[in-house]
């Protein structure tokens, strides 16, 4: 359970670390689910690193319905309740899950970005939970710009070639050059052990380095009371084919793809 201090920090900074939020058994379930996903990726899977990268950055999305370990952790652990408390929401809806595996030696960074501009969702009550099943040292962990969730939406770009495939070029402000001016930003980051999780707002700017050792993580994206469907004229990441025909713009995401998971 998150306390008042963590709730205040989440709303101020847009990211908090919660230690020991998952039990050893729950971490094992997540690990088993990740390994199942690696062995049999969905058709949504991708490799987000270059062919000449000595490691590999694997991603896959929206597998909770096919991988029972994922669904069990989402529904029976405390992460949905914690997300609800942090968002100040009366209920929590699952948006999607996301597996991110950087194999040892991966050079590919995760560049600075916000998550929500890639999505088909509007609303301020949002929360992602990043759950590692391996120890994560400082150089490989997620970094966050404190308070950036309170600022504007920033231009989403492809991670490897920095193309604007979503919002039209010039329609959103570009990201500042955080790496060149790190001293000008309050950057939050935590070394993590299995069982620890980072909860962050979908507009919080975040990034991560490569991986000197294997880094397997499971991320769960939750939505709160004010989240609504925001159809886009382009392919979102992840994509929900046919949803635009079933939910009008501005409608709550009341759909089997997005089940209520708390209370």
Regions found by a protein language model. Give the residues of each.
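Generic beta-strand structural signal
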Residues: 90-92, 96-97, 108-110, 125-131, ...
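Non-heme Fe(II)/2-oxoglutarate
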Residues: 33, 40, 44-52, 157-159, ...
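Short, conserved beta-strand element in jelly-roll/cupin
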Residues: 120-137, 191, 199, 221-225
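Non-heme Fe(II)-dependent double-stranded beta-helix
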Residues: 1-13, 19-112, 118-120, 235, ...
């Amino acid at each position: 359970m998150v306390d008042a201090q963590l709730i205040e920090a989440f709303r101020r900074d847009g990211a908090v670390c919660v230690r020991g939020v998952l039990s050893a058994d729950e971490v094992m379930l997540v690990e088993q689910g990740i390994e199942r996903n690696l062995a049999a990726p969905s058709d949504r899977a991708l490799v987000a690193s270059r062919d000449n990268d000595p490691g590999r950055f694997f991603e896959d999305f929206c597998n909770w319905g096919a991988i029972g370990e994922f669904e069990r952790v989402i529904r029976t652990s405390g992460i949905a309740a914690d997300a609800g408390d942090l968002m100040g929401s009366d209920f929590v809806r699952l948006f999607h899950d996301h597996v991110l595996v950087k194999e040892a030696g991966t050079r590919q960074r995760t560049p600075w970005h916000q998550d929500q501009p890639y999505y088909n969702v509007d609303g301020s009550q949002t929360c992602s939970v990043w759950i590692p099943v391996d120890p994560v040292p400082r150089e490989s962990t997620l970094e966050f710009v404190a308070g950036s969730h309170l600022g504007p939406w920033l231009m989403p770009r492809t991670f490897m070639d920095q193309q604007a495939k979503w919002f039209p070029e010039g329609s959103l402000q570009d990201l500042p050059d955080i790496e060149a001016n790190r001293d000008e930003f309050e950057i939050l980051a935590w070394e993590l052990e299995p069982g620890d999780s980072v909860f962050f707002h979908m507009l919080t700017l975040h990034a991560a380095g490569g991986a000197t050792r294997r880094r397997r993580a499971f991320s769960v994206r939750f939505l709160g009371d004010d989240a609504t469907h925001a159809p886009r004229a382009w392919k979102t990441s992840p994509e929900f084919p046919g949803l635009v025909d079933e939910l009008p713009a501005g409608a709550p995401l009341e759909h089997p793809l997005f089940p209520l998971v708390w209370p």
